[in-house]
Amino acid sequence: MSDLTPPSQILLRHTREFAERSVIFSGDLQDLLPAQFNAKQIRVHTQEYHHWRLLSPVLKNDIQFGVLPSEDLVSKTDTVIFYWPKNKAQAQFQLEHLCSLFPSQTNIFIVGENRSGIGSAKDLLAENVGLHKMDAARRCSLYYGCLKQKPVFNMESQWRRYQVKDVQIKTLPGVFSANQLDEGSQLLLSSFDIPLSGKVLDLACGAGVLGTILARQSPQIELTLSDVNAAALESSRANLAVNHIKARVVPSDLYSDIPERFNLILSNLPFHKGLKTDIKMIEKCIEEAPGHLYKGGKLRLVANAFLPYPKLLNRTFGHYEVLTQNARFKVYQATL
């Protein structure tokens, strides 16, 4: 049980509640609870590719990776267990779609850490779900309610749009830099001498903004965009299409599904796992980069200045350089 997150631990206090239910798990699930959960039937939808990879050997066809679950996946379930994410817009997006697939009186359970903002769930869903707090423990809350009426879900209305010079950007809720180009990415883009050439990997690409802008400036590059999140990948595909750019989009847990080498790997890596600071992704990105770079290839990363990139880069490459910086961010580069 120690490997389970606090929201999953609070759910386990109510296992009898689910024994005869057909359950679909969705939302910000961050552990393997569905593999050991006691219910009549268990299905899982996840936007996270690494969760799909871990759970699919056990759940087979009863787990689905994608932006949203299919009607077929939810068709034989009668109960929703939704893990509240830290992004309210993402929660609303996913729950609105989920609720649109179920008949009225469907049972909805919502669980999450208090600091994630789960307290807003009751008001956010008031029109469609009558929620009440069922339990509170481990700084988490569990809400329960029944679907009162199905919402009307419109996928097209979920997209957010902005422009970076002549590049059009589209993003789905929950994807990094949803409303504007973030400061770190701006600094990273400013560090490049255009035009670029060769094979380029935009790793943990988010909406693919970095790769899309660089490909627009240097159309001769052979671009690959990768991310672990389905909404990020869908946003990347949309941005490539709207800007008429050809590139490959790959679901991958860092390098898990990327066997080849590149002339340049670039990234603005996240350093949070859910609500907690976690640099394991950063460590893995740097440690495994040499296996994915040609000789003379470069790893270029932007990061908050306080993160331990110098130590990590020195440990793997034996050297690094700071190409540019401001008060908050630094752009690092290491060459194989």
From Swiss-Prot:
Its EC number is 2.1.1.172. InterPro entries: Mtase_sm_N (IPR013675), rRNA_ssu_MeTfrase_C (IPR023543), RsmC/RlmG (IPR046977), SAM-dependent_MTases_sf (IPR029063), Small_mtfrase_dom (IPR007848). Pfam families: MTS (PF05175), MTS_N (PF08468). GO terms for cellular component: cytoplasm. Its main location: cytoplasm. It comes from the Bacteria. The keyword Protease does not apply. Disulfide bonds: none annotated. It catalyses: guanosine(1207) in 16S rRNA + S-adenosyl-L-methionine = N(2)-methylguanosine(1207) in 16S rRNA + S-adenosyl-L-homocysteine + H(+). GO terms for molecular function: 16S rRNA (guanine(1207)-N(2))-methyltransferase activity. Keywords: Cytoplasm, Methyltransferase, rRNA processing, S-adenosyl-L-methionine, Transferase. It is found in: Cytoplasm. Specifically methylates the guanine in position 1207 of 16S rRNA in the 30S particle. Belongs to the methyltransferase superfamily. RsmC family. Monomer. This is Ribosomal RNA small subunit methyltransferase C.
